[in-house]
């Protein structure tokens, strides 16, 4: 009987493994077959729920275990974090003599943002549950340096860090022990460089020294001559990433996307792999090769669509799409990307207060009926560190929520069960598109990505197509037709334009009424309008010919922030306030001078008498 039950379980497990392998994301092998310690493999399965490795993990883990430098280039959501953390823990848990925190730092993981720093740290903590003597830690901007120095003084075995704060400690924290350093990992390397940390990374590499442990002091537990291992992980490939690879990696193996452009610049190497379906992903990097092609991969299960929306109807279209998403499937999470922090703040306040129908209340006295019946969060770089941490952590645990964010959330963050990504503002570079859409359709799950485009921006689709992204049009008019028309507005049989749709007109009026009913909301709208126009004018390179600020109708831009005034009136109002403030300051200054003059005259007359 027991044998029959065990056989049934094994058959069920084999069927599950085969199903995952067929999905094209998971390998038909186990973590233990990759060479990982049994306890660590059990930890991955029992505590973290990973029954089988992804193809990227199946290919990367054995190569990293072998000690080779590695460049991992794979789509977001393919398990790259586990791919490098698991081999580190495997080596450290079996190290002789046993690793102690007094030995200092053995591994450095460098990440672009604070949120990703915390995310990697949380994953590391779970993996180390059975290996309590290996101490994880992090240092990042926004934290108190004194507390970080105290933690470094005690010792951190695996340290996750943002570039700026790491460089600070390398230069100024004498108690930061890293003489036993064996691994340096650059996670989301493309994002690190896009955020302008290139010079910091160069300094960090110089301060950490050459590829070998040359000190050989008596208390070193890493023998002299042991080669330091560097790993570089990136969702996209470009010239900057290639330059960093040449600077930091020694004769590396590349694991990642199999594309023709890439193979023209790289020579193929096929080391022994645990799974034949993963062998094609290994590439040997030739340091003398031409720069890597700027390319990226997008999960095949991701549905990509665009919305062609006139500027004046953008706000209504966004709210309508969000409402439709949550009415279609209540238990889901959505991330909306904006180009500026002011835009995030305005839309966050708007969604937190906007009622529909206007001034509606539920049966419970004083309870507002909000337009979106879900929690709203925001995330951007100007928020206090504790607020950022709270928003990031709470949104991850919510089942039904929307997150409004700048690109700070596009950098490798893993939000469970995000079903849709909305790019309300186009990314500054076409390559940034992949980071944003990578927040959904992770580890084989389905996802949807929506991109808002004005009619004058439609050529942006051609730019995306150059990089392998193909989008179909979203049926916005059909979605708008689903909503009931409030009041006595007649339903038109055939709506000629988006702006003339009864739902759009009624919703726009209600939004403008809210903005003008509250001075704070109006101020947020003005700030968002100004920063959005400035950001639009800042597009560079090939995108400058697509996003032309002179082609914008600024009155329609104002409308997209629920402002009734023409931009000239908004600007004039702001100009008047500025002139009035300067005039008041001049008057105060003149009054002060008069008082001093009168005081001085009185003193002189007293002296004369």
From Swiss-Prot:
Signal peptide: none annotated. Residues 572-581 have a biased composition (Basic residues). Transmembrane segments: none annotated. A motif (Q motif) lies at residues 29-58. ATP binds at residues 74-81. GO terms for molecular function: ATP binding; ATP hydrolysis activity; RNA binding; RNA helicase activity. GO terms for cellular component: nucleus. Residues 314-491 form the Helicase C-terminal domain. The keyword Ribonucleoprotein does not apply. Residues 600-609 have a biased composition (Polar residues). A motif (DEAD box) lies at residues 187-190. InterPro entries: DEAD/DEAH_box_helicase_dom, Helicase_ATP-bd, Helicase_C-like, P-loop_NTPase, RNA_helicase_DEAD_Q_motif, SPB4-like_CTE. Residues 566-609 are annotated as: Disordered. Keywords: ATP-binding, Helicase, Hydrolase, Nucleotide-binding, RNA-binding. Belongs to the DEAD box helicase family. DDX31/DBP7 subfamily. PANTHER family: RNA HELICASE. This is DEAD-box ATP-dependent RNA helicase 17. It comes from Arabidopsis thaliana (Mouse-ear cress). The gene is RH17.
């Amino acid at each position: 009987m027991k044998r029959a039950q065990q056989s049934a379980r094994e058959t069920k497990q084999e069927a599950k493994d085969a199903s995952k392998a067929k999905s094209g994301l998971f390998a038909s092998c186990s973590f233990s077959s990759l060479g990982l310690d049994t306890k660590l493999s059990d930890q991955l399965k029992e505590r973290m729920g990973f029954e089988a490795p992804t193809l990227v993990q199946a290919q990367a883990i054995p190569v990293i275990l072998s000690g080779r430098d590695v460049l991992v280039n794979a789509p977001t959501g393919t398990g790259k974090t586990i791919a490098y953390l698991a081999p580190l823990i495997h080596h450290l848990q079996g190290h002789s003599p046993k690793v102690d925190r007094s030995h200092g730092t053995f591994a450095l993981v460098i990440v672009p943002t604070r949120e990703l720093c915390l995310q990697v740290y949380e994953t590391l903590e779970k993996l180390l549950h059975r290996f309590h003597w290996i101490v994880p830690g992090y240092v990042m901007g926004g934290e108190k340096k004194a507390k970080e120095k105290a933690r470094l003084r005690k010792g951190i075995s695996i340290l996750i860090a943002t570039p700026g704060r790491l460089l600070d400690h390398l230069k100024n924290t004498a108690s930061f022990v890293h003489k036993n350093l064996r691994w340096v990992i650059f996670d989301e390397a493309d994002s690190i460089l896009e955020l302008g940390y290139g010079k910091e990374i160069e300094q960090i590499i110089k301060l950490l020294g050459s590829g070998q442990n040359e000190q050989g002091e008596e208390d070193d537990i890493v023998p002299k001559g042991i080669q330091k291992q560097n790993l570089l992980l990136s969702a996209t490939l470009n010239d900057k990433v290639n330059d960093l690879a040449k600077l930091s990696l020694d004769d590396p193996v590349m694991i990642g996307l199999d594309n023709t452009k890439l193979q023209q610049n790289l020579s193929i190497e096929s080391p022994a792999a645990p799974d034949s379906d993963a062998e094609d992903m290994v590439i040997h990097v030739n340091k003398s090769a031409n720069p890597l092609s700027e390319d990226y991969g997008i999960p095949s299960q991701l549905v990509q669509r665009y919305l062609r929306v006139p500027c004046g109807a953008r706000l209504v279209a966004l709210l309508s799409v969000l409402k439709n998403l949550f009415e279609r499937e209540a238990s889901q999470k959505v991330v909306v990307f904006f180009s500026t922090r002011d835009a995030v703040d305005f839309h966050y306040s708007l969604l937190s207060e906007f009622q529909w129908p206007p001034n509606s209340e539920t049966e419970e006295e004083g309870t507002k009926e909000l337009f979106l019946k879900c929690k709203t969060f925001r995330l951007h770089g100007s928020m206090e560190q504790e607020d950022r941490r709270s928003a990031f952590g709470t949104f991850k645990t919510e089942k039904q929520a929307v997150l409004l964010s700048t690109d700070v959330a596009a950098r490798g963050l893993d939000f469970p069960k995000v079903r849709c990504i909305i790019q309300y503002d186009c990314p500054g570079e076409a390559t940034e598109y992949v980071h944003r859409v990578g927040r959904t359709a992770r580890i084989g799950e389905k996802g949807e990505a929506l991109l808002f485009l004005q009619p004058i921006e439609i050529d942006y689709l051609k730019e995306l197509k150059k990089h392998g992204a193909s989008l179909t049009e979203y049926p916005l008019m059909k979605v708008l037709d689903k909503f009931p028309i409030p009041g006595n507005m007649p339903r038109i049989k055939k709506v000629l334009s988006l702006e003339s749709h009864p739902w759009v007109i009624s919703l726009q009026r209600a939004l403008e009424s809210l903005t003008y009913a509250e001075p704070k909301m109006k101020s947020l709208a003005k700030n968002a309008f100004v920063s959005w126009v400035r950001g639009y004018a800042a597009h560079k390179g090939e995108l400058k010919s697509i996003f032309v600020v002179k082609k914008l109708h600024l009155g329609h831009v104002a409308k997209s922030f629920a402002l009734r005034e023409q931009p000239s009136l908004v600007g004039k109002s702001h100009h008047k306030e500025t002139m009035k403030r300067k005039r008041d300051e001049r008057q105060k200054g003149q009054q002060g001078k008069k008082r001093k003059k009168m005081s001085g005259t009185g003193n002189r007359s007293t002296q004369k008498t």
